[in-house]
Amino acid sequence: MIKKFFLSLFITLSLITGSYSASSDTGNGPKKTDYDKAVSFVNSAKKFEKKGNLEKAKKRYEKAQKLLIKSNENKPNKPNTLNYLGFTTRKLGDFELGEKYYLQGLAIDPNHVGINEYLGELYVVTKRHNLAIE
């Protein structure tokens, strides 16, 4: 009788525990893409930049850029990726390459708001105001 009781208790507890673990979130949902990770780094970098912590911002931009390059290799010619590639490259001081990424993105989507805005900022910083007005 005692054996049956403990066996029943054990089976009941196993079933209860099993049902809870089956419903728990194991974190096996969709993984973030390199692009998504890069956007997170860019957003983090912008916050550090706003606070004046330029060294941390630079490191985040560098991490974002590496992920964006990888993303662009895997899925080439996506305007959003090219926009962020231009942005991170510009933020890291390479205006010429940043401009190339922006122009490549505009060739695909001439009305891309982000690219047009950031390219305008690049033109202002590089003292080409006439191009920024376009």
PLM feature spans:
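Register position in tetratricopeptide repeats
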Residues: 50, 91, 125-126
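Canonical positions in the second alpha-helix
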Residues: 71, 104-105
